[in-house]
Amino acid sequence: RVAVQETDLYVQALKPLEDITRELILKHRGYIEKYIKTHPEFLDALEPWRDRGPAPVIICDMVSAGQKAGVGPMAAVAGAIAEHVGADLLKYTVEVVVENGGDIFLKTDNPVTMGIVAGTSSLSMRMGRCIKSKEKPVGVCTSSGTVGHSLSLGKADAICVVSDSCSLADAAATSIGNRLKSK
């Protein structure tokens, strides 16, 4: 587990990567923080962000995910950090799992069954999905209006989305969750 400010990553790999993970968190958070300093409205945007010219890749991924899902770019921030840190960690290991507040970047040689935490719902940890990520990394992201501290405009206990893009999975889970107004 490696924590830097609001970013709290659980990393599982074939060897210890804590120091490298900390450096990567600082690198990718730095890109986001610097962009927010020059575009402060980015932080609170709840609508898709219009392209404002050149930006770091992590920002471009967040913007693209938000545009595709119909949400603001920060709806993709946890998935984007998990994805970019995870992709960089693959330079040091062939398998890695990076979890960031329910958003997971996964690259493993063997299938993994993931349970879905849905708070006090009777379905919590009673459902799972077998994820295969041998050929390419996969993003598995969960959004909730009843569990955790992230902003959700809906009431879903858990919305789980699987995608090639962890950023897009995060934004899509948020978007779907925002639409569910009653249980």
Language model regions located:
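A structural signal for small-residue-enriched, beta-sheet-centric alpha/beta enzyme cores
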Residues: R1-P16, W49, G115-V117, S121-K183
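Short glycine-rich, polar/acidic loop-and-turn segments at beta strand-coil junctions
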Residues: A13-K15, I36, G102
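Alpha/propeptide regions of enzymes that mature by internal proteolysis
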Residues: E18-V98, V162-K183
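Glycine-rich anion/phosphate-binding loop at the beta-strand->alpha-helix junction
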Residues: Q67-G148, S152, V162
